[in-house]
A protein has these predicted regions:
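SAM-dependent methyltransferase catalytic region
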Residues: 1-126
Length: 126
């Protein structure tokens, strides 16, 4: 799953000029960094649900790495992901990548393109 998300992101990056990506600060997480960051999370695998907040989701690479890590660890509960991203150009790919996570691992997700709410107060009850 993570590999497909990375491939989708690479396609996106090659379709958008670097100068435009630079203007928006678009430098997406690479595979090594995403896997390393996912390894830093401490998960309680006995929980029936785990909620993930990705406050600068980009194309969903980090969220996908965390989801993949959970399944590699044998997690069998429900995963909820809340993604925030301000770049409207990236949103369709973020949607595509989160839909892939849903298809492969039944992950529920919410996407938002605004930062008008308090992340700590964001509520994703499903």
């Amino acid at each position: 799953m993570l590999n497909e998300v990375l491939e989708n992101t690479e396609r996106f990056m090659s379709s958008v000029p670097k100068t435009k990506r630079k203007k928006y600060g678009q430098f997406f997480t690479n595979e090594t960094t995403a896997k390393f960051m996912a390894s830093l999370f401490c998960f309680d695998l006995s929980k029936q649900k785990i909620e993930i907040l990705d406050a600068g989701a980009g194309t969903g690479i980090l969220a996908a790495a965390v989801i993949q890590k959970l399944y590699e660890l044998g997690y069998v509960g429900k995963i909820y992901v809340t993604c925030y991203e301000t770049d409207e150009l990236v949103m369709p790919l973020l949607e595509e990548n989160m839909a892939l996570c849903n298809k492969l691992h039944n992950v529920s997700y919410t996407l938002s393109s605004t930062y008008k709410c308090n992340f700590l107060g964001a509520d994703n009850k499903q």
